[in-house]
Amino acid sequence: ERPVEMIVVKNDGTEVRELLLLDSTRVWLQLGAEITYPKKFPRKHRPVHLSGEAFFDVSHDPSRPFTVSTTAVEIKVLGTRFDVNSAIDGAVTEVALESGSVALHMPEKENESVVMKPGELAVATLSDTSISVAETNPYIYSVWKEKELVFRAQPLGCIMKILERAYGIDIRLGNEILERTVYTGRFKKSLPIEEILTIIEMNTSMRYRINADGSIDIW
């Protein structure tokens, strides 16, 4: 057989990179992420390999499942939207499912798989070959690819997690009542985080402080 020609795309730039695969699947690559896939997908499946973080909007094709493999886990889908992060030295892979359904299995446990539902986060750990699943807000995990931050009556606790991911900053919120306080707003992600926090502060009872190490305390 003729060897399969592979395409390797690495995001060495300073902005999120968007790809359109031949099957109409859309992929957003986070900075430093690398994806490898065949120049032409086989007839029965659509395999890609990921190192780093990416968001997938997979085109629906029941006859050819789409699979994303990382060092820790393989994710099998038919058509769905989800975020995969294997950036943490490859030994841990996080999968946040926005819509559709995916099945995860680890190479060491070929006959065991975990099926995810929308609104869940799965964490696959290579060291003990385990997959844990918990409920989450998938937007927290895919916000890095958006140009705008949109909050619709969301609790401040969730908003701060989104801002942490979007800006790569440690935010500590030590007030349980404030965590549950809902806020609605829309911000361009090009805005400095101080501007966003100041606007939220003006419309809620929240106060914030930026520390010398860049972390932020909320009370």
Segments from the language model and where they lie:
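A residue-level detector for the "anchor" residue at the start of short, highly conserved motifs
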Residues: E1-W219
